[in-house]
Amino acid sequence: MIEVLLVTICLAVFPYQGSSIILESGNVNDYEVVYPRKVTALPKGAVQPKYEDAMQYELKVNGEPVVLHLEKNKELFSKDYSETHYSPDGRKITTNPSVEDHCYYRGRIENDADSTASISACNGLKGHFKLQGEMYLIEPLVLSDSEAHAVFKLENVEKEDGGPKMCGVTQNWESYEPIKKASDLNFNSDQQRFAKRYVELVIVADHRMFMKYKSDLFSICSRVHDIVNFINWFYRSLNIRVSLTDLGIWSDQDYITVQSSAENTLHSFGEWGKSVLLKQKRHDNAQLLTAIVLDEDTLGLAYLSSMCNPWTSVEIIQDHSPINLLMGVTMAHELGHNLGMKHDEKDCLRGATLCIMRPGLTPGRSYEFSDDSMGYYQSFLDQYKPQCILNKPLRIDPVSTPVSGNELLEAGEE
């Protein structure tokens, strides 16, 4: 008989609720401090991995007990994931960190069918969970007791001053192809709506990002991993797995001219991606994450219906918010344009959920792709038949013959 060991981390709600606090996510009004309790069932004598494949936490939200079930996101990284930065003298340094035992999870709340969760457990619990239609953020508190966490609603994060923040894609960038509404698509009731597809993603952080995060490579990597975990979650409704295959950090200088004109920077990044990046790393899509302030309150820009094109399967995104969830929404939005999605109406809702493809970013309860976005995506698949997103990310043997089939020319291919 297997003996079950319960590993318990003190469960309690801190004896007060705070009215205001400064957290990594910004200035937060109305939060509560909780101590999550981790419950792990292990056979007697078993060696506990640092990050288990499945975990369960108990905590109290608004005074009510909540059980959070988490499962490791095993599709977050490609198996040949790499990280690249540069020495002060311009020497390129590429490493292949082990990602088998990573700390990024997705999950749900027990007894809440509409719940979701996207959590990093690298240093405490950090991320979001959707409970009874409300979006909550959780992050560790820097207190004498290391197990204390803040839980707060996204709507309680103070909004930044200034006008609405917008995507830079306009009608001038869009084609006028007829689309199929999601409700009109012929889906086999015994099959999923969309066949499973895979996007191998490269993210490049520019030199301003490196300086913004005080030359701390680890901080940039951790932030990007958190964000991609959110992106991966959003795209599950389309049966798309977004896997990070390389994270590049321009630690010594910018390798294109990064300017406040989003259109010019996007054009330059696309040229660099085709002439340089594509020869360095197999990928389907590349995003430039920049700390420059883009003109006209623009948060990002992308080409429409360009996935698998070696020059235009790119986006640029401004690092506009300390909240990883909101950065994930923006980056998922711009990627959506590459996958054929046009903008929703500015007040688009899917039930009580905000539509990801709204033209402007609005902090809300939660985010999903609309039926129209799904229709645009299906039309893109039908018209363009993108091949690069059909292949599942696999480990690449650097001495093996390059494998084709992704519409992007690999080094060594004809």
UniProtKB/Swiss-Prot annotation:
Signal peptide coordinates: 1-20
Organism superkingdom: Eukaryota
GO cellular component: extracellular region; plasma membrane
EC class: hydrolase
Tissue: Expressed by the venom gland.
BP GO terms, sorted: proteolysis
GO molecular function (one): toxin activity
List of residues binding Ca(2+): 200, 284, 388, 391
Binding residue positions for Zn(2+): 333, 337, 343
Sequence ranges assigned to domain Peptidase M12B in this UniProt record: 197-393
Descriptive protein name: Snake venom metalloproteinase
Lineage: Eukaryota, Metazoa, Chordata, Craniata, Vertebrata
